[in-house]
A protein has these predicted regions:
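Extreme N-terminal starter segment of soluble prokaryotic enzymes
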Residues: 1-4
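Acetyl-CoA-dependent GNAT
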Residues: 6-12, 17-95, 101-110, 143-144, ...
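C-terminal "cap" of GNAT-fold acetyltransferases
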Residues: 114-128, 132-137, 141-162
Length: 162
């Protein structure tokens, strides 16, 4: 059975390990190993994750299938019912089986959002198509200098709920 479990600071090592596995599998062909290494160190180091938990009020969820953790997501609230999905990652073995759509459905039932916004790399065609399938629409193009000569070149996408 698929579950979303609220993560705590005790789960940081699980989140970091999953990020390494998923990013090295999924993102190396898109942005290259050096940028993957840089971003993993920048975003998933202990201090950065603690800041996301404590200062930025991000809520992390572990995605569990039976007893195994197969991914995680991170969301924050822009208002009472508008949310930003910062991270949404599932291990490759669990992709293309309806898992991602089921996770979004569960998240929607938990949050009862008016909207969910996210950013996705413009070359991440599999994820873009997944979000289109789940009724997200591109609202803008973003280019963000993340340091060390790297840029994030993203589409911002949003899904509105009734």
């Amino acid at each position: 059975m698929l579950q979303l479990q609220i993560a705590s600071k005790n789960d940081l090592s699980v989140i970091t390990e999953l990020a390494k596995i998923i990013w090295n599998t999924h993102y190396v062909p898109i942005i290259g190993q050096l940028q993957v290494n840089y971003m993993l160190e920048k975003i998933y180091n202990y201090d950065s994750l603690i800041e996301q938990f404590e200062k930025k009020n991000h809520q992390f969820y572990l995605i569990k299938l039976e007893q195994s953790v197969i991914g995680f997501l991170n969301i924050s609230s822009n208002s009472d019912s508008d949310f930003f999905l910062h991270k949404f990652y599932i291990v490759a073995e669990s992709c293309h089986k309806g898992t991602g759509t089921s996770v979004l459905d569960k998240l929607q039932s938990i949050l009862q959002p008016k909207s969910i916004t996210l950013a996705v790399n413009r070359q991440n065609f599999k994820s873009i198509n997944f979000y289109f399938k789940n009724k997200f629409k591109i609202t803008s193009v973003k280019n963000l200098d993340i340091g060390n000569g790297y840029e994030m070149n993203d589409f911002e996408m949003v899904k509105h709920f009734n």
